[in-house]
Regions:
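Conserved, non-catalytic sequence blocks in retroelement Pol enzymes and Pol-derived host proteins
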Residues: 2-3, 16, 60-65, 104-112, ...
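A short acidic-Thr-Gly-centered motif at the start of a beta-strand
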Residues: 1-6, 82
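Buried hydrophobic packing segments
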Residues: 72-77
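RNase H catalytic domain
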Residues: 78-150
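A short, polar/acidic, helix/strand-boundary loop motif
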Residues: 30-71, 97-107
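Two-metal-ion RNase H-like nuclease active-site motif
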Residues: 6-20
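Short beta-strand scaffold segments in enzyme catalytic cores
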Residues: 21-25
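Flexible, low-complexity interdomain linkers flanking nucleic-acid-processing modules
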Residues: 146-179
Length: 179
């Protein structure tokens, strides 16, 4: 038993070398702020990311998958931080390398190591703790769907895997602070 109680919400993220990256929060039960929804998701293509920040690691056609998975996790943490304050929240990820980097708050690819430190500091300020859970790619289908196909900002939400999700804008202020 940790100091912070477990969160009923679950996070998941994924990256795809050909299309982009995404993250999702699945609500554990009803959430009054978002009635009728099972969760929220963000997604971004590599072309869209290139407009945010140009890096030799993540450009369309030259994506290093472990770095991409790591970045997707950091953006997922930051985007859904308000749902994770004062709780321990599980992040499902299908990259063992990115999982190890997240667990150690370190990444051997500069400048993403600095990004990780900024996001972890942001989480500490929110009294949020994350634990990673590796899942086989086949069991990460929800995040996989969002990282491989464009979904619009439909206010009614999108039904994916029998659940209703609404698209939100990703937050990356702490992620890109050191880029």
């Amino acid at each position: 038993m940790g100091i912070l109680p477990d969160n009923t919400h679950t996070l998941a993220c994924d990256a795809c070398t050909s299309w982009g990256m995404a993250g999702v929060i699945t609500f554990g039960g009803s959430f009054p702020e978002y009635p009728g929804l099972d969760g929220l998701f963000w997604q971004m293509t590599w072309s869209e990311w290139k407009k945010v920040y140009q890096t030799p690691y993540l450009i369309p056609g030259k994506v290093i998958i472990n770095v991409a998975e790591f970045l997707a996790a950091l953006i997922t943490y930051e985007t859904f931080a308000k749902f994770c304050s004062h709780k321990t929240t599980t992040l499902r990820i299908d990259s063992r390398v990115a999982q190890a980097w997240l667990d150690s708050c370190r990444c051997p690819k500069h400048p993403f190591d600095r990004c990780a430190q900024a996001v972890h500091l942001h989480m500490l300020k929110r009294s949020a703790k994350f634990r990673t859970s590796w899942v086989p790619s086949g069991d990460n289908s929800l995040a996989d769907n969002f990282s491989r196909e464009r979904f619009s900002a439909n206010s009614n939400g999108h039904v994916v895997s029998g659940q209703r999700f609404r698209k939100v804008k990703p937050t990356w202020n702490n992620v890109i602070k050191f880029l």
